[in-house]
Structures are given as C-alpha cells and as structure tokens.
Amino acid sequence: MARKSDEDTNPMDKFMDRLRGSPGDGGPGRPDPSQRKVHFSIWYFILALLLIVWMQTYMGEQQSEKISYSEFKQRVHDGNVQNLVIEHDRITGTMKENDGPGRRFNTIRVEDPELVKQLEAKNIRFSGDVQNPWLGLITWWLLPFAIMIFFWSFLMRRMGGGPQGVLSVGKARVKIFAEKEITITFDDVAGIDEAKGELEEIVQFLKDPGKFQRLGGRIPKGVLLVGAPGTGKTLLAKAVAGEAGVPFFSMSGSEFVEMFVGVGAARVRDLFGQAKDHAPCIIFIDELDALGKARGLNPIGGHDEREQTLNQLLVEMDGFDPRSGVIIMAATNRPEILDPALLRPGRFDRHVAIDKPDIRGREAILRVHVKEVKLGSEVDLKKIAGMTPGFVGADLANLVNEAALVAARRDRDEVTMADFQEAADRIIGGLEKKNRAMNPKEKEIVAYHEAGHALVAMLLPNVDPVNKVSIIPRGIAALGYTQQLPTEDRYLMTRNELLDRLQVLLGGRVSEEIIFGDVSTGAQNDLQRATDIARSMVMEYGMSERLGPLTYTRDPRSAHLDLGLGSRERDYSEMIAQEIDEEITRIVEDAHEKVRATLKRERGCLEKLAKILLEKESIDGEELKQFCQEVKSHIARDPVQVEGGAA
C-alpha cells in the first residue's frame, strides 16, 4: 500500500500523530505513550476547568452590571429603571438610556416592604420569578463538564488508548513493541544455551522463510516455553523478536478472560487479526495456564467463558497459514494442567524446556548483570555462582542489585565479595535483625541448636559442606541458621544421602536434648522437613525395605513449582496406610538415635563450637574451615566410627 503524502494527510491526523508519537521512534529520553497520555490529560483538564470558570465570570460580566441596592433605590426614585424581575435573592432589570438600548443590571435583594409602593408610584413595570436552583448548576457546570469529558475520551481514543466504551471490550489489550523498540538480543540472555539453540531456527525462519519453504518444510506454528518462575521465558521470547527484527505482541493469559461471556473469544480474534496485519511478527502469551487449563479439569464451578476463549484460541491456531510469518510463543510453569488439544502437533508443536542454570550458567548470568556494576578486584563470580545453587536468572539479578545496595549503604566505591555474601544471606535467610533482643538462655539454646546442625554435617560423608553458621536472627522467624553449599550441581540423591540429610536436620533438636534435657519450638521447621523426606522415601521413591519398591501416592506435582497441585489421591488399604506411618516413624527415629549417639560422643566439639558462636555470633571462612579440620582430625584419632548411611 502506498504511503500517504504530507499534503494528503488530514491536519487533525497530523496533530494526533504528534501526540501519539510514531511507533518505533521512542528512544532514550522520549516518554512512553502512557506517560504522554497522563501528561496530556492533566493539562487538558486544567485548561478546561480554567475555561469554564472564565466563561462564567466573563459572560456574567458581559450580560449585566452589578450595582448596590442603594444605587438601585436611587435609580427607582429617578425613574431610570424598567422591566424589573424580582427573584428570591436578587433583582434584575434594565437601565434607561437616552441614546440607545438600556443596560442590564442586577443587585442583591434586600427585605424592603416599601419597594413595591415606590415602583407603583413611578409606574415602573415589574414581575416576580421563582428560579430553579438546579438549572444554573446544569447549565454552567454539568453540561460544560460533560462536553469536556466527551472530547477527552475522543482524543484518548485517537491517541491509541483511554476509555473505549462498551463497544470495544472485545479489543485485545495487547502490548505492541515495534521492531526498533526491542533492544534485547540473544547476547542479553545467558545460562540457557540449549534453549537459545532451539529458538535460533525460529529466528532464521522470520528472517528468511523461503529457506525452509523451498523444500516443503513447515515451521512450527507455536513454541511453548516451559520452566520455573524467573528462568527467563519472557526475556527469551523478546530476544527472539529482537534478533529477528519483527514486531512483538505481548499479552497475559489472564487478560483474555472477563466476566462478560464472549469477550475473551473476541479478544483472541482481535489479537490474531492485528498480528496478521503486521506479519511477520511474534505473538507472546505469558502465563498460558491462566487461559489454556484443560477443559473439564474442574467440573464443579467450571468457567464457561474461559473454555470458550480456549476454544477460540484453538480455532485461530488452526486457521492461520504457517507461511504467513506469524509465530506464536507462550510461557508457562504448569504444563501438566494445559489442555492436550493445545499441545498437539500443529499448535504448540515445539516445547522448549528452560531449566534452572547450572554453575556455569549462573556465572554467565552474573557476567551479564554486573556489566554496569563497579566490582572489587577480589570478586570471584565463579565462587558467587557456587554459593547460589538453585538460583534462577531473576534471583541472580536481584542478588547483584542487593549487593550494590549493600555497598552503597556502607559508602563503598565498589562492590566487594563481602557485599555479595551479605546479599546472598539476605535473600536466602531474610533481613538480618541484630536488634532483636533474646535473653541469654534463648541465645544459648540457639547456639547449641545451630552447633548441633553444623557438627553433624561436618561428621557425615554424604552431605554438603558447611559454609556458614550464625545465631543472628533473620527474616520473620529464623533465630539462627546453618548454611551448607554443594560442591557441584546435583540432579539425583541416593538413599544414603537422604538418610544423612535427615540426621543433619535432627542435629539441632538432639543437641538441645543432650545439653539442656529439654526441647524447644525452634526445631519445628527441621522436623517438618525431616518428616517430608521420610514420607517421600516411603511413598514416592520406594526406599523402604519393609514396603518394597512401590509408590503409594498420586500427588499431581508440578515439575517447575515447589508445591503440589492438589490433594494426594489415596488408593491403598488401611493396613498399608498403617504400615506407611510406622515406616516413616521408624526412619525418623533411627536417624534420631544415630544423631544422639554421635553428639554424645562428640560433646566436647559441640560445646566448643557453641561457645565460639556465643562469642562471635557468626562463623564462616577460614575460621570455620579450621574448626572442621580439627573435628575431622579428632575423629581420625578416635577409633569409634561415625554412623551414617543405611537405616
């Protein structure tokens, strides 16, 4: 289509184009469209209100002259007034002029019983009038205000936003990024090289579709990005659009569904219609599970509008030509609840898994985020990556930002390794609360509790090494913590490793039993985690010798979320349920007895570590390494073998 020349363009369209700003030319320093709309609306209402006030004042002054009541009485006495109208609170009329029409005037009415007699004596014509108080309000305020709102709504629609009215609820609330507005490329995405490699083919198709079509190949219509929250699914989708240099249509799955029946389906049709007009382009639907949940998954209280919207999405994905250059990308962290029809070949026929990054991936992500940060010479990104297992891209970005804030709070010129350590502790354990007052008895209990965890971890062979022990309160409920860091990324755990982890979790409570002959509530979280491990060993992993290699649960867990998606479905007898309970109890009690025997034997080391904690409140680095070596040397000289592993 030929572009209109400047001469053919409507002046109103030119003006609105200036207000909107042409797509794609928003550079640094240029306000985004939403800011322009806000600024325009503020100035519009200020000027409109000033105009209304000015019109009332000016027009009132032009229509009549205000005079005092004494001057009015004098003019009545002189016979220089005519056509008086006496209202409830004022008197209006016309002054007689010798050389032209009379001037209108008004005055405040005063309670004057003699006025009517004087008017009759002077043969002045007068009448009474009852004024409606609402008429002036409507005429001078409500009507101008309604006109002002109408024009504002019209201008907002012309600027591409604002209230659209009932007739436009079916329009897709899509965020459109033009080619020049997307500055993110694959260089800004790190730690997920496998996923980037999967999507390079999509970029090549958008750049050169003929390369694939000449051999009869068909590019995937849809790409589903699956991964845990914060792994970079949205960032990766934008990077694909940035690499290909095509428009990017972004919309959340929850924005399709409304309370009005049919609105979601209309928005799906509108979204695909806009995308076809801007092809080649990318449609990105974030949180697809809000829209694409399997039909019939919740038959009681189901959502007909959501299912109707999903049906329309399925129809649209079937209806467009894959050669049109429109690629659909979506992201979810709950693929197991999506409708099977959405995942079949021909719709989302390519699934790209985005896992949590390994240590090399975390180091690469950190290098991306520290580009604008002044780092100290001793900062080791590889070491930071090693002490942040399980962190995803969003967590690492937050870590770098927190470290920079810690350094700024301490008035440093650069971010040091200590700042990164403090930031990691803050993210993992919560805000440090040195001012939380604990009495000496509580502090001693916490010290022995954490010393018990740390000492058991030092003595057992199948657990992660201890990195830091602290009795400084953090977060909402943590009065102390023992930090263990893995030496490498792990994807499997053996039975012996799980049993040793049980012993570490029980070390704090057993330490309290041995030293004080009593237990506290501080072990609540430890006991919960220990019970969960034992239950999983029996019911999910088949690690119970008594029950054998069987699984006794149908818990619909998400592979990308640390929670179950529903209640466990029980399909075993009461006798098996009793045996499961007995086996879970046995595993935990066996671990408890082993820890008790170990800490009784190493009570001297336990008391020494607790004493250090009471003095310094926190142990890490070289001092902790030295203590660990002393403990291991002591154990090497002791002929008694530390119990660990099989139960």
Curated annotation (Swiss-Prot):
Region Disordered: start-end pairs: 1-33
Membrane topology: Multi-pass membrane protein
Cofactor binding mode and count: Binds 1 zinc ion per subunit.
GO terms (BP aspect): protein catabolic process; proteolysis
Cytoplasmic topological domain residue ranges: 1-39, 156-647
Keyword Repressor: no
Periplasmic side: 61-134
Binding sites annotated in the UniProt record for Zn(2+): H449, H453, D526
Active site per UniProt: E450
Superkingdom classification of source: Bacteria
Transmembrane segments: 40-60, 135-155
The enzyme's E.C. designation: 3.4.24.-
Major subcellular location class: membrane
UniProt cross-references to CDD domains, sorted A to Z: RecA-like_FtsH
InterPro entries in alphabetical order: AAA+_ATPase (IPR003593), AAA_lid_3 (IPR041569), ATPase_AAA_core (IPR003959), ATPase_AAA_CS (IPR003960), FtsH (IPR005936), P-loop_NTPase (IPR027417), Pept_M41_FtsH_extracell (IPR011546), Peptidase_M41 (IPR000642)
Coiled-coil ranges from the UniProt annotation: none
Family: In the central section; belongs to the AAA ATPase family.
Family annotation (PANTHER family): ATP-DEPENDENT ZINC METALLOPROTEASE YME1L1 (PTHR23076:SF97), METALLOPROTEASE M41 FTSH (PTHR23076)
Described purpose of this protein according to its UniProt entry: Acts as a processive, ATP-dependent zinc metallopeptidase for both cytoplasmic and membrane proteins. Plays a role in the quality control of integral membrane proteins.
Subunit structure: Homohexamer.
Listed name of the protein: ATP-dependent zinc metalloprotease FtsH
Organism for this UniProt entry: Syntrophobacter fumaroxidans (strain DSM 10017 / MPOB)
